[in-house]
Amino acid sequence: MIPDKLQNIMKQDGVVAIATLGPDGPHMVNTWNSYLKVSQDGRLFIPAGYMHKTEANIAYNPNVLITLGSSKVEGLHGMGAGFLIKGKASFVLSGADFDFMKEKFGWLRATLAVKIESATQTW
């Protein structure tokens, strides 16, 4: 479900924006492209150090929008490619998915797991 071009973007320097919607409106948080990992079943894993507002919003509404890109990857109109990911998210506080990410990011308090519903190249 994760296109090769998106996987290539994830290896590059860049910022990821994660949007959630809670009872008091939208909220955005950022992380780095290189922090994103893919599970064996195709879910997107994101280390959460803080993200307390994001966690509260996901408990209220699990829908997330994620954007990321890189100027170093060939896109639809030359150099520069980006994606919009839509999915359902949950916070994982223990178990195999948590341990997988904790090994890579010792500072995390939780794993943000996203079941991808669509990944659309936007640029």
What are these regions (language model features)?
Residues 1-123:
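Binding-site signature for planar aromatic cofactors or substrates
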